[in-house]
Amino acid sequence: MDAQSAPSGQVQVRFTTRNEDLAVGDTPIFVPTSLKRYGLSQIVNHLLKTEKPTPFDFLVQGQLLKTTLDEYIVQNGLSTESILDIEYIQSTLPPAYLASFSHDDWISGIQLTSDTILTSSYDGIARVWDKSGEIKFQSTGCGSSLKSASWHIPNQSFLTASLDQKIFHWVIEEPESMLDAEKKSSGILQTLFVGHKDIVERVRSLESSSVFISASADNTVGIWDFERSPETTLESFSSSISKKRRRKNAEFTPQAGARSPLILCEGHTGPVMDIVFSDDPSVAYSVGQDHTIKTWDLITGQNVDSKITKAPLLCVEKLTDLHLVICGSSARHIVVHDPRAGSDKIVSHTLSGHKNLVSGLSASPENPYMFASVSHDNTCRVWDVRATSGSIYTISRAEKTGSQWDKLFAVDWNKSIGIVTGGTDKQLQINQSSSFGKSE
Protein backbone atom coordinates (compact mmCIF):
# COMPACT_ATOMS: atom_id res chain seq x y z
CA MET A 1 0.00 0.00 0.00
CA ASP A 2 1.40 3.43 -0.85
CA ALA A 3 0.50 6.96 0.19
CA GLN A 4 -1.29 7.68 -3.07
CA SER A 5 -3.85 4.88 -2.57
CA ALA A 6 -4.43 5.46 1.14
CA PRO A 7 -4.37 9.20 1.86
CA SER A 8 -6.35 8.75 5.09
CA GLY A 9 -4.68 5.54 6.25
CA GLN A 10 -2.16 4.91 8.96
CA VAL A 11 1.59 4.90 9.22
CA GLN A 12 3.99 3.56 11.82
CA VAL A 13 5.95 6.33 13.53
CA ARG A 14 8.78 6.30 16.02
CA PHE A 15 8.81 9.38 18.27
CA THR A 16 12.27 10.59 19.31
CA THR A 17 13.60 13.52 21.30
CA ARG A 18 17.01 14.74 22.46
CA ASN A 19 15.54 15.63 25.84
CA GLU A 20 15.68 12.57 28.07
CA ASP A 21 13.14 14.08 30.48
CA LEU A 22 10.51 14.07 27.70
CA ALA A 23 11.33 10.71 26.11
CA VAL A 24 8.42 8.33 25.38
CA GLY A 25 10.39 5.27 24.30
CA ASP A 26 11.29 4.18 20.79
CA THR A 27 8.57 1.58 20.15
CA PRO A 28 6.84 2.36 16.81
CA ILE A 29 3.09 3.01 16.95
CA PHE A 30 0.43 3.42 14.27
CA VAL A 31 -1.06 6.90 13.85
CA PRO A 32 -3.51 8.31 11.27
CA THR A 33 -1.78 9.98 8.31
CA SER A 34 -4.40 12.74 8.53
CA LEU A 35 -2.74 14.15 11.67
CA LYS A 36 -0.95 17.50 11.75
CA ARG A 37 1.22 19.00 14.47
CA TYR A 38 -1.62 19.43 16.98
CA GLY A 39 -2.79 15.81 16.71
CA LEU A 40 0.75 14.48 17.04
CA SER A 41 1.28 16.74 20.05
CA GLN A 42 -1.81 15.23 21.70
CA ILE A 43 -0.41 11.72 21.19
CA VAL A 44 2.99 12.60 22.69
CA ASN A 45 1.35 14.27 25.70
CA HIS A 46 -0.84 11.18 26.17
CA LEU A 47 2.27 8.98 26.14
CA LEU A 48 4.02 11.29 28.59
CA LYS A 49 1.00 11.24 30.94
CA THR A 50 1.63 14.83 32.00
CA GLU A 51 -0.95 16.81 33.98
CA LYS A 52 -0.45 19.93 31.87
CA PRO A 53 -0.14 19.40 28.10
CA THR A 54 3.04 20.67 26.44
CA PRO A 55 2.81 21.93 22.84
CA PHE A 56 5.35 20.33 20.51
CA ASP A 57 6.71 20.89 17.03
CA PHE A 58 7.78 17.94 14.90
CA LEU A 59 10.77 17.35 12.64
CA VAL A 60 10.76 14.76 9.89
CA GLN A 61 14.12 14.35 8.13
CA GLY A 62 15.14 17.71 9.55
CA GLN A 63 12.07 19.51 8.20
CA LEU A 64 9.46 21.15 10.40
CA LEU A 65 6.14 19.42 9.79
CA LYS A 66 3.64 22.06 8.62
CA THR A 67 1.18 19.75 6.80
CA THR A 68 -0.56 16.45 7.50
CA LEU A 69 1.60 13.34 7.61
CA ASP A 70 -0.12 12.18 4.43
CA GLU A 71 0.81 15.34 2.54
CA TYR A 72 4.40 15.08 3.76
CA ILE A 73 4.64 11.43 2.70
CA VAL A 74 3.26 12.18 -0.79
CA GLN A 75 5.42 15.30 -1.31
CA ASN A 76 8.59 13.44 -0.34
CA GLY A 77 7.86 10.19 -2.17
CA LEU A 78 7.77 8.06 0.97
CA SER A 79 5.79 4.90 1.72
CA THR A 80 3.30 4.29 4.51
CA GLU A 81 4.76 0.80 4.80
CA SER A 82 8.00 2.19 6.24
CA ILE A 83 8.52 3.41 9.80
CA LEU A 84 8.64 7.21 9.95
CA ASP A 85 11.05 8.66 12.52
CA ILE A 86 9.63 11.88 13.97
CA GLU A 87 11.60 14.09 16.36
CA TYR A 88 9.57 16.30 18.69
CA ILE A 89 10.71 19.57 20.25
CA GLN A 90 8.91 22.01 22.51
CA SER A 91 7.04 24.72 20.60
CA THR A 92 7.99 28.37 20.93
CA LEU A 93 5.91 31.45 20.27
CA PRO A 94 6.97 33.96 17.59
CA PRO A 95 9.08 36.79 19.06
CA ALA A 96 6.87 39.84 19.62
CA TYR A 97 7.96 43.38 18.77
CA LEU A 98 8.55 45.49 21.88
CA ALA A 99 10.25 48.75 20.93
CA SER A 100 12.71 50.62 18.71
CA PHE A 101 15.29 53.20 19.83
CA SER A 102 16.65 55.70 17.29
CA HIS A 103 20.35 56.32 16.64
CA ASP A 104 21.95 59.17 14.71
CA ASP A 105 23.78 56.82 12.34
CA TRP A 106 24.10 53.16 11.37
CA ILE A 107 24.29 50.66 14.23
CA SER A 108 27.34 48.41 13.90
CA GLY A 109 27.51 46.45 17.17
CA ILE A 110 25.28 45.34 20.06
CA GLN A 111 25.99 43.63 23.37
CA LEU A 112 23.48 43.10 26.18
CA THR A 113 23.60 42.79 29.95
CA SER A 114 20.61 41.91 32.13
CA ASP A 115 19.38 45.50 32.15
CA THR A 116 21.37 47.51 29.58
CA ILE A 117 22.17 47.58 25.87
CA LEU A 118 25.62 48.60 24.63
CA THR A 119 25.73 49.80 21.02
CA SER A 120 28.42 51.04 18.67
CA SER A 121 27.63 53.27 15.72
CA TYR A 122 29.06 54.71 12.54
CA ASP A 123 28.85 58.17 14.13
CA GLY A 124 31.84 57.09 16.23
CA ILE A 125 29.87 56.98 19.49
CA ALA A 126 29.14 54.10 21.86
CA ARG A 127 25.94 54.30 23.89
CA VAL A 128 24.56 52.42 26.88
CA TRP A 129 20.75 52.24 26.93
CA ASP A 130 18.36 51.01 29.57
CA LYS A 131 15.32 48.91 28.64
CA SER A 132 13.06 51.98 28.51
CA GLY A 133 15.15 53.57 25.76
CA GLU A 134 16.99 56.12 27.91
CA ILE A 135 20.68 56.67 27.17
CA LYS A 136 22.57 56.13 30.43
CA PHE A 137 26.04 56.70 28.99
CA GLN A 138 27.44 58.09 25.75
CA SER A 139 31.11 58.04 24.81
CA THR A 140 32.95 60.88 23.17
CA GLY A 141 33.34 60.54 19.42
CA CYS A 142 36.97 59.84 18.56
CA GLY A 143 36.96 60.79 14.90
CA SER A 144 36.19 57.45 13.25
CA SER A 145 33.22 55.12 12.81
CA LEU A 146 32.92 52.20 15.21
CA LYS A 147 32.56 48.60 14.03
CA SER A 148 32.11 46.71 17.29
CA ALA A 149 31.63 47.01 21.06
CA SER A 150 32.15 44.53 23.88
CA TRP A 151 31.59 44.75 27.62
CA HIS A 152 34.65 43.98 29.73
CA ILE A 153 32.95 44.43 33.10
CA PRO A 154 29.17 44.79 32.52
CA ASN A 155 27.92 48.32 33.21
CA GLN A 156 31.41 49.41 34.26
CA SER A 157 33.82 49.23 31.33
CA PHE A 158 33.81 48.25 27.67
CA LEU A 159 35.84 48.18 24.45
CA THR A 160 35.10 49.68 21.05
CA ALA A 161 36.74 48.85 17.71
CA SER A 162 37.03 51.40 14.93
CA LEU A 163 37.56 51.86 11.21
CA ASP A 164 40.81 53.73 11.94
CA GLN A 165 42.56 50.59 13.25
CA LYS A 166 42.18 51.37 16.98
CA ILE A 167 40.57 49.79 20.03
CA PHE A 168 39.35 52.04 22.85
CA HIS A 169 38.83 51.03 26.49
CA TRP A 170 36.13 53.09 28.22
CA VAL A 171 35.35 53.23 31.95
CA ILE A 172 31.93 54.43 33.10
CA GLU A 173 31.71 56.68 36.16
CA GLU A 174 28.41 56.76 38.02
CA PRO A 175 26.91 60.09 39.23
CA GLU A 176 28.50 61.19 42.50
CA SER A 177 25.34 62.41 44.23
CA MET A 178 21.60 61.83 44.29
CA LEU A 179 21.17 65.22 42.59
CA ASP A 180 23.07 63.88 39.59
CA ALA A 181 21.35 60.48 39.57
CA GLU A 182 19.10 61.36 36.65
CA LYS A 183 22.01 62.56 34.51
CA LYS A 184 23.99 60.41 32.11
CA SER A 185 27.00 58.66 33.59
CA SER A 186 30.29 60.23 32.62
CA GLY A 187 33.03 58.25 30.95
CA ILE A 188 36.78 58.04 30.87
CA LEU A 189 38.86 56.97 27.90
CA GLN A 190 41.09 54.68 29.91
CA THR A 191 43.41 53.06 27.37
CA LEU A 192 44.08 53.11 23.65
CA PHE A 193 45.16 49.83 22.02
CA VAL A 194 47.03 50.16 18.72
CA GLY A 195 48.78 47.75 16.39
CA HIS A 196 46.38 46.72 13.67
CA LYS A 197 47.10 48.10 10.19
CA ASP A 198 43.51 48.10 8.91
CA ILE A 199 39.90 48.20 10.11
CA VAL A 200 39.26 46.39 13.40
CA GLU A 201 36.16 44.41 12.46
CA ARG A 202 35.48 42.84 15.85
CA VAL A 203 36.60 42.99 19.47
CA ARG A 204 35.59 40.45 22.14
CA SER A 205 36.38 40.37 25.85
CA LEU A 206 35.50 38.29 28.90
CA GLU A 207 34.69 39.56 32.38
CA SER A 208 36.62 36.65 33.86
CA SER A 209 39.86 37.42 32.00
CA SER A 210 42.20 40.34 31.38
CA VAL A 211 42.79 39.00 27.85
CA PHE A 212 40.71 40.21 24.91
CA ILE A 213 40.83 39.43 21.20
CA SER A 214 40.27 41.25 17.92
CA ALA A 215 39.70 40.50 14.24
CA SER A 216 41.06 42.87 11.62
CA ALA A 217 40.94 43.51 7.90
CA ASP A 218 44.77 43.45 7.98
CA ASN A 219 44.46 39.60 7.93
CA THR A 220 45.48 39.22 11.59
CA VAL A 221 43.96 38.20 14.91
CA GLY A 222 45.00 40.37 17.85
CA ILE A 223 45.63 39.03 21.35
CA TRP A 224 45.70 41.78 23.98
CA ASP A 225 45.79 42.12 27.75
CA PHE A 226 44.49 45.02 29.83
CA GLU A 227 47.45 44.63 32.19
CA ARG A 228 50.26 42.92 30.26
CA SER A 229 50.07 44.52 26.81
CA PRO A 230 53.27 46.57 26.27
CA GLU A 231 53.02 50.33 26.59
CA THR A 232 53.53 52.39 23.44
CA THR A 233 53.36 56.03 22.32
CA LEU A 234 50.27 58.14 21.69
CA GLU A 235 51.72 59.96 18.67
CA SER A 236 49.63 58.26 15.99
CA PHE A 237 46.46 58.75 18.00
CA SER A 238 47.12 62.41 18.75
CA SER A 239 47.83 63.20 15.11
CA SER A 240 44.38 61.94 14.10
CA ILE A 241 42.62 64.35 16.50
CA SER A 242 42.64 68.06 15.74
CA LYS A 243 44.33 70.39 18.24
CA LYS A 244 41.06 72.28 18.75
CA ARG A 245 39.20 69.10 19.66
CA ARG A 246 42.02 67.95 21.98
CA ARG A 247 41.90 71.28 23.85
CA LYS A 248 38.11 71.10 24.10
CA ASN A 249 37.91 67.47 25.17
CA ALA A 250 40.35 66.10 27.72
CA GLU A 251 38.63 62.74 27.22
CA PHE A 252 40.58 62.34 23.98
CA THR A 253 43.75 61.60 25.94
CA PRO A 254 43.66 58.06 27.36
CA GLN A 255 44.38 58.20 31.09
CA ALA A 256 46.45 55.02 31.03
CA GLY A 257 48.14 55.81 27.72
CA ALA A 258 48.45 53.45 24.78
CA ARG A 259 49.30 49.77 24.56
CA SER A 260 50.26 47.38 21.78
CA PRO A 261 49.17 43.75 21.30
CA LEU A 262 50.71 40.78 23.04
CA ILE A 263 50.60 38.96 19.70
CA LEU A 264 49.30 39.69 16.21
CA CYS A 265 48.51 36.23 14.88
CA GLU A 266 49.12 35.60 11.20
CA GLY A 267 47.54 32.80 9.18
CA HIS A 268 44.54 34.22 7.39
CA THR A 269 45.15 35.25 3.77
CA GLY A 270 42.27 37.73 3.69
CA PRO A 271 40.44 40.09 6.05
CA VAL A 272 39.48 38.50 9.37
CA MET A 273 35.82 39.38 9.91
CA ASP A 274 34.96 37.95 13.33
CA ILE A 275 36.36 36.03 16.27
CA VAL A 276 34.84 34.35 19.34
CA PHE A 277 36.22 32.76 22.49
CA SER A 278 35.81 29.02 22.88
CA ASP A 279 34.41 27.56 26.12
CA ASP A 280 38.08 27.31 27.02
CA PRO A 281 39.15 30.98 27.32
CA SER A 282 42.63 30.10 26.05
CA VAL A 283 41.15 29.11 22.66
CA ALA A 284 39.36 31.20 20.03
CA TYR A 285 37.76 30.67 16.61
CA SER A 286 38.12 33.19 13.79
CA VAL A 287 36.52 33.44 10.35
CA GLY A 288 37.56 35.41 7.30
CA GLN A 289 37.06 36.32 3.70
CA ASP A 290 39.64 33.64 2.82
CA HIS A 291 36.82 31.08 3.37
CA THR A 292 38.46 29.64 6.50
CA ILE A 293 37.51 28.80 10.08
CA LYS A 294 40.65 28.88 12.22
CA THR A 295 41.27 27.70 15.77
CA TRP A 296 43.83 29.66 17.81
CA ASP A 297 45.82 28.88 20.94
CA LEU A 298 45.67 32.26 22.70
CA ILE A 299 48.61 31.44 24.96
CA THR A 300 51.08 30.79 22.13
CA GLY A 301 49.30 32.63 19.32
CA GLN A 302 49.52 29.52 17.15
CA ASN A 303 46.91 28.50 14.58
CA VAL A 304 46.17 24.91 15.66
CA ASP A 305 43.46 24.05 13.13
CA SER A 306 42.08 25.43 9.88
CA LYS A 307 39.08 24.41 7.80
CA ILE A 308 38.29 25.74 4.31
CA THR A 309 34.67 26.31 3.30
CA LYS A 310 33.08 27.20 -0.03
CA ALA A 311 32.46 30.91 0.61
CA PRO A 312 33.84 33.93 2.48
CA LEU A 313 32.81 33.86 6.15
CA LEU A 314 31.65 37.06 7.85
CA CYS A 315 30.57 36.21 11.41
CA VAL A 316 30.95 33.45 13.98
CA GLU A 317 29.22 32.27 17.16
CA LYS A 318 29.50 29.19 19.37
CA LEU A 319 26.70 26.85 20.51
CA THR A 320 28.26 25.88 23.82
CA ASP A 321 26.25 22.83 24.86
CA LEU A 322 26.46 21.26 21.40
CA HIS A 323 30.20 21.95 20.98
CA LEU A 324 29.42 23.55 17.61
CA VAL A 325 30.53 26.73 15.87
CA ILE A 326 28.17 28.51 13.46
CA CYS A 327 29.44 30.86 10.75
CA GLY A 328 27.57 33.30 8.52
CA SER A 329 28.69 33.46 4.90
CA SER A 330 28.58 35.81 1.93
CA ALA A 331 26.78 33.01 0.06
CA ARG A 332 23.68 33.67 2.25
CA HIS A 333 23.88 30.43 4.22
CA ILE A 334 25.01 29.52 7.74
CA VAL A 335 27.73 26.91 8.18
CA VAL A 336 27.43 24.56 11.17
CA HIS A 337 30.91 23.34 12.11
CA ASP A 338 32.25 20.90 14.73
CA PRO A 339 35.69 22.21 15.75
CA ARG A 340 36.58 19.35 18.09
CA ALA A 341 39.71 17.33 17.48
CA GLY A 342 38.94 14.18 15.53
CA SER A 343 36.05 15.72 13.62
CA ASP A 344 36.87 14.99 9.98
CA LYS A 345 33.94 16.96 8.58
CA ILE A 346 34.66 20.49 7.42
CA VAL A 347 30.95 21.34 7.63
CA SER A 348 28.36 19.38 9.62
CA HIS A 349 25.58 20.96 7.55
CA THR A 350 24.40 24.31 6.22
CA LEU A 351 21.25 26.30 6.92
CA SER A 352 19.68 28.38 4.16
CA GLY A 353 16.97 31.02 4.05
CA HIS A 354 18.50 34.49 3.99
CA LYS A 355 18.41 36.34 0.67
CA ASN A 356 21.69 38.21 1.19
CA LEU A 357 24.92 37.77 3.11
CA VAL A 358 24.73 36.82 6.80
CA SER A 359 26.29 39.57 8.91
CA GLY A 360 25.67 38.63 12.56
CA LEU A 361 24.85 35.70 14.86
CA SER A 362 23.80 35.24 18.48
CA ALA A 363 23.06 32.05 20.41
CA SER A 364 19.85 31.60 22.40
CA PRO A 365 20.42 32.27 26.11
CA GLU A 366 18.18 29.33 27.11
CA ASN A 367 17.74 26.82 24.31
CA PRO A 368 21.04 25.15 23.30
CA TYR A 369 19.76 24.34 19.79
CA MET A 370 18.57 27.82 18.85
CA PHE A 371 20.22 31.01 17.62
CA ALA A 372 19.41 34.24 15.78
CA SER A 373 21.00 35.66 12.64
CA VAL A 374 20.86 38.99 10.82
CA SER A 375 21.53 39.68 7.17
CA HIS A 376 21.94 42.35 4.55
CA ASP A 377 18.46 41.25 3.43
CA ASN A 378 17.29 43.40 6.40
CA THR A 379 15.75 40.52 8.34
CA CYS A 380 16.53 38.62 11.51
CA ARG A 381 15.87 34.88 11.50
CA VAL A 382 15.57 32.43 14.37
CA TRP A 383 16.91 28.91 13.80
CA ASP A 384 16.96 25.51 15.45
CA VAL A 385 19.96 23.46 14.30
CA ARG A 386 17.78 20.34 14.40
CA ALA A 387 15.49 21.87 11.75
CA THR A 388 17.77 21.75 8.72
CA SER A 389 15.12 22.81 6.18
CA GLY A 390 15.10 26.49 7.17
CA SER A 391 14.53 29.06 9.90
CA ILE A 392 11.71 28.80 12.42
CA TYR A 393 10.78 32.50 12.42
CA THR A 394 11.61 35.61 10.42
CA ILE A 395 11.61 38.97 12.20
CA SER A 396 11.02 41.95 9.92
CA ARG A 397 11.66 45.59 10.74
CA ALA A 398 8.81 47.22 12.64
CA GLU A 399 9.53 50.71 11.34
CA LYS A 400 9.81 50.79 7.56
CA THR A 401 12.11 53.35 5.95
CA GLY A 402 11.01 52.60 2.41
CA SER A 403 14.59 51.94 1.33
CA GLN A 404 15.31 48.69 -0.47
CA TRP A 405 18.97 49.02 0.49
CA ASP A 406 18.58 48.74 4.27
CA LYS A 407 20.76 46.10 5.92
CA LEU A 408 21.19 44.61 9.38
CA PHE A 409 24.68 44.43 10.87
CA ALA A 410 24.31 43.36 14.49
CA VAL A 411 22.31 41.10 16.80
CA ASP A 412 22.45 40.00 20.42
CA TRP A 413 20.04 37.90 22.48
CA ASN A 414 19.57 37.48 26.20
CA LYS A 415 16.84 36.30 28.54
CA SER A 416 15.87 39.57 30.21
CA ILE A 417 15.76 41.88 27.17
CA GLY A 418 15.22 39.63 24.13
CA ILE A 419 16.53 39.70 20.57
CA VAL A 420 18.04 43.09 19.75
CA THR A 421 19.02 44.05 16.20
CA GLY A 422 20.38 47.08 14.37
CA GLY A 423 21.73 48.27 11.03
CA THR A 424 21.43 50.97 8.40
CA ASP A 425 17.90 52.06 9.36
CA LYS A 426 19.43 53.45 12.61
CA GLN A 427 16.76 51.68 14.70
CA LEU A 428 17.68 49.50 17.66
CA GLN A 429 14.80 46.99 17.54
CA ILE A 430 13.80 44.73 20.44
CA ASN A 431 11.73 41.55 20.02
CA GLN A 432 10.74 39.23 22.83
CA SER A 433 8.17 36.65 23.92
CA SER A 434 7.73 35.32 27.46
CA SER A 435 8.04 31.70 26.33
CA PHE A 436 10.33 32.22 23.36
CA GLY A 437 13.62 30.39 23.42
CA LYS A 438 12.71 28.17 26.37
CA SER A 439 15.02 25.21 26.55
CA GLU A 440 13.71 21.72 26.40
Swiss-Prot record:
It is found in: Nucleus, Nucleolus; Nucleus, Nucleoplasm. Signal peptide: none annotated. InterPro entries: G-protein_beta_WD-40_rep, NLE, WD40/YVTN_repeat-like_dom_sf, WD40_repeat_CS, WD40_repeat_dom_sf, WD40_rpt, WDR12/Ytm1. GO terms for biological process: assembly of large subunit precursor of preribosome; maturation of 5.8S rRNA from tricistronic rRNA transcript (SSU-rRNA, 5.8S rRNA, LSU-rRNA); maturation of LSU-rRNA from tricistronic rRNA transcript (SSU-rRNA, 5.8S rRNA, LSU-rRNA); ribosomal large subunit biogenesis. Disulfide bonds: none annotated. GO terms for cellular component: chromatin; nucleolus; nucleoplasm; nucleus; PeBoW complex; preribosome; preribosome, large subunit precursor. Pfam families: NLE, WD40. The modification Phosphothreonine is found at residue 140. PROSITE patterns: WD_REPEATS_1, WD_REPEATS_2, WD_REPEATS_REGION. GO terms for molecular function: ribonucleoprotein complex binding. Keywords: Nucleus, Phosphoprotein, Repeat, Ribosome biogenesis, rRNA processing, WD repeat. Residues 11-90 are annotated as: Ubiquitin-like (UBL) domain. The modification Phosphoserine is found at residue 242. Component of the NOP7 complex, which is required for maturation of the 25S and 5.8S ribosomal RNAs and formation of the 60S ribosome. Component of the NOP7 complex, composed of erb1, ppp1/nop7 and ytm1. The complex is held together by erb1, which interacts with ppp1/nop7 via its N-terminal domain and with ytm1 via a high-affinity interaction between the seven-bladed beta-propeller domains of the 2 proteins. The NOP7 complex associates with the 66S pre-ribosome. Interacts (via UBL domain) with mdn1 (via VWFA/MIDAS domain). This is Ribosome biogenesis protein ytm1.
